[in-house]
Design a protein with these regions (language model features):
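Extracytoplasmic ligand-binding site segments that recognize negatively charged/polar headgroups
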Residues: 1-78, 89
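A ligand-binding cleft/hinge motif common to bilobed small-molecule-binding domains
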Residues: 72, 76-97, 146
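Solvent-exposed loop/turn segments at secondary-structure junctions
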Residues: 1-2, 26-29, 84-87, 105-108, ...
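C-terminal capping/gating helix-and-loop segments adjacent to ligand/active sites or protein-protein/ligand interfaces
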Residues: 139-195
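A bilobed periplasmic-binding-protein/Venus flytrap-type ligand-binding module shared by bacterial periplasmic
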Residues: 1, 39, 110-122, 141-144
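Periplasmic-binding protein-like
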Residues: 18-27, 50-54, 60-61, 65, 93-118, 132-154, ...
């Protein structure tokens, strides 16, 4: 796609034949991230954005794999995915056709975490694993196995095709207390707008 939309408003303004695939926020972390993204970017205007997206949504899938598969099969023009998806195609498949579409309003980050359960019987082993996971050696594995940005600056050790991909210029966030208090309402409003 030579000129992808650069905002949700630009996406909404496209002809209804322009289709996207998104994930269900009740069963998919990218789907939940989409709800938070629109809420963070548009606040009280979020329902208006969801209503505008409705004619463009080909389907809402249970998870990312189904959505991305439909996109790869040519069923939709765009898919809600990770900004690192193009790096996967470039590195693993030597396919440079895919790109991340930066949106002017910014992007929400999906941060994956690791921790130790209180009930762990192997706390020392878990601590050693977490120390390794957050070390440079452990983080060198993340870009090309989990296809996410590392939590440490790898400098020249970041694969060239991974580092060459566009990254969001503006990251949005939603206050944790607000997510706890409002996420169910936001999810329900999004799903209702898409019915």
């Amino acid at each position: 796609m030579p000129n992808p939309p650069a905002s949700f408003e630009e996406l909404i303004a496209l002809p209804p034949s322009f289709k996207i695939v998104i994930e269900d926020p009740r069963s998919s972390t990218p789907g939940l991230g989409n709800v938070l993204w629109i809420q963070a970017a548009y606040g009280d205007r979020a329902p208006e954005i969801w209503a505008g997206l409705k004619p463009h949504v080909l389907t809402v899938t249970r998870g990312w794999s189904e959505a991305y598969g439909l996109f790869l099969d040519g069923e939709a023009d765009m898919v809600l995915s990770y900004t690192t998806s193009p790096a996967y195609h470039a590195i693993a498949e030597n396919d440079h056709r895919f790109a991340f579409a930066p949106f002017k309003e910014g992007h929400i980050a999906q941060i994956e975490v690791a921790g130790i359960l209180k009930t762990s019987e192997k706390t020392d082993l878990a601590k050693r694993f977490l120390a390794y996971l957050t070390s440079v050696a452990g983080q060198k594995l993340i870009p090309t196995t989990n296809w996410m940005y590392p939590v440490v600056d790898l400098g020249a050790d970041l694969p060239t095709d991974f580092g060459a991909q566009s990254k969001p210029e503006k990251l949005l966030s939603v206050d944790e207390a607000q997510i706890t208090a409002q996420s169910r309402t936001w999810i329900d409003a999004a799903l209702q707008a898409l019915e």
